């Protein structure tokens, strides 16, 4: 009990053959293999990008420009 017996695997395989048909199973396995290869290559690429020697980008500082008219500037509406 608790573990899968060999006859459990036979039943699982029989259900897959009945659901998908014998012709579609090789294509499904092939596409699953391709997907796994692509996934693994993307994971390796992401890990290599994380270990790059580039220093972290410095934040860009900017000055704030006040767009409200001040008392020093004459009001254009009253002229």
UniProtKB/Swiss-Prot annotation:
Amino acid composition bias (Basic and acidic residues), ranges on this chain: 43-52
Cellular compartment(s): Cell membrane
Residues covered by region (Disordered): 43-79
Pfam families with a match to the protein in the record: TatA_B_E
Keyword match Nucleotide-binding: no
InterPro entries named in the record: TatA/B/E (IPR003369), TatA/E (IPR006312)
Record's keyword terms, sorted: Cell membrane, Membrane, Protein transport, Translocation, Transmembrane, Transmembrane helix, Transport
Segments passing through the bilayer: 1-21
GO CC terms: TAT protein transport complex
Topological type in the membrane: Single-pass membrane protein
Homology family: Belongs to the TatA/E family.
NCBIfam families: PRK00575.1 (NF001854), tatAE (TIGR01411)
HAMAP family: TatA_E (MF_00236)
Function: Part of the twin-arginine translocation (Tat) system that transports large folded proteins containing a characteristic twin-arginine motif in their signal peptide across membranes. TatA could form the protein-conducting channel of the Tat system.
Name recorded for this polypeptide: Sec-independent protein translocase protein TatA
Origin organism lineage: Bacteria, Bacillati, Actinomycetota, Actinomycetes, Mycobacteriales
Gene responsible for this protein: tatA
